[in-house]
Swiss-Prot record:
InterPro entries: ORF4b_HKU4-CoV (IPR044319). Plays a role in the inhibition of host innate immunity by inhibiting the interaction between host IKBKE and MAVS. In turn, this inhibition prevents the production of host interferon beta. Additionally, may also interfere with host antiviral response within the nucleus. Keywords: Host cytoplasm, Host nucleus, Host-virus interaction, Inhibition of host IKBKE by virus, Inhibition of host innate immune response by virus, Inhibition of host RLR pathway by virus, Viral immunoevasion. This is Non-structural protein ORF4b. The keyword Endoplasmic reticulum does not apply. It is found in: Host nucleus; Host nucleus, Host nucleolus; Host cytoplasm. One of its GO terms (biological process) is symbiont-mediated suppression of host type I interferon-mediated signaling pathway. GO terms for cellular component: host cell cytoplasm; host cell nucleolus; host cell nucleus.
Length: 285
């Protein structure tokens, strides 16, 4: 009888142990991404053959499997708009300009000269038209090839009209005379754009000042605000008109020295004009 009781006790103990193993395995089979933490406690069976289990706290152990080539996550960037791009230009170092004969008499500027003298402003004595501003920082820059540009500028008759203030400089706008094709059939009134294109083709970096073709007449930088407004108002009272043929092409260093108010050219190339200025052009004024 005692043997039977002992066998029953052993069987019951093994049955309780099997139930314990099944309960643990059932928790493991719920989710492979869940594991037991240190907070889960399983009490061994007591002498009374009862098993007590405490609730287990699950923590995530999911790992991200990344490919070696995708070590860094991809980032999304907003598209770039054209307005977001800023083109940085180098400051110009030299000025390529057209100059006129010293004997040229600007008779239609006489009234303007007298009015500016009342404001203690002197007209410039270095009349020129800026053809292009270029960036050439090399100290030994050679401008000898500009000699081949002069034939293109031959017989380029310029018309000056309409006063305006650009920045704080009194200027007059310049353009090729549109009626010159009737006199010279080989002209197309596109000399200035072709000359600028010639500079680009020969490797010169052109600085875009976004200013129209003009000729500076007087500097108004030192005037008080009231006198500056009065000088700027002269543009509405005077409407001079002049014609001139450039006699030479000059290269001047920006900020270079001057003699008697005239910039010292680094290079000067004469323009051999065939067309002679004729008096009847004044009848168009």
């Amino acid at each position: 009888m005692s043997i039977v009781l002992r066998l029953l006790s052993v069987l019951k103990h093994q049955q309780n142990k099997m139930q314990l193993d099944l309960s643990v395995n059932s928790y493991k089979l719920l989710d492979y991404s869940m594991e037991w933490s240190s907070d889960s406690v399983v009490l061994p069976p007591t002498s009374s053959d009862k098993t007590v289990m405490m609730p287990a706290k699950a923590t995530s152990s999911r790992k991200r499997h990344r490919k070696p080539k995708l070590q860094y996550a991809k980032r999304r960037f907003s598209p770039v708009n054209p307005n977001d791009l800023v083109l940085v230009q180098q400051e110009p170092t030299h000025c390529v300009r057209l100059v006129f004969p010293l004997s040229k008499r600007w008779i239609h500027f006489d009234g303007l000269v007298y009015s500016l003298a009342r404001l203690n402003v002197s007209m410039t004595v270095d009349y020129h038209v800026t053809l292009a501003l270029i960036y050439a920082p090399e100290a030994g820059e050679c401008f000898g090839n500009f000699l081949h540009l002069c034939p293109l500028l031959k017989d380029c008759l310029l018309e000056f009209k309409k006063l305006c203030v650009l920045g704080k400089t009194l200027t007059i706008l310049a353009s090729e005379w549109p009626f010159f094709t009737d006199v010279k059939k080989n002209k197309d009134n596109l000399t200035v754009p072709k000359a600028v294109e010639w500079l680009k083709e020969h490797g010169y970096e052109i600085y875009n000042s976004q200013l129209p073709l003009h000729m500076s007449l007087a500097k108004l930088h030192d005037l008080p605000q009231a006198q500056f407004a009065e000088a700027a108002g002269l543009c509405h009272y005077f409407d001079p008109r002049e014609f001139a043929l450039p006699c030479a092409l000059e290269v001047v260093k920006i900020g270079g020295g001057k003699v008697n108010g005239r910039s010292i050219p680094l290079a000067r190339f004469p323009i051999n004009n065939e067309f002679k200025f004729i008096p009847y052009l004044y009848q168009c004024v």
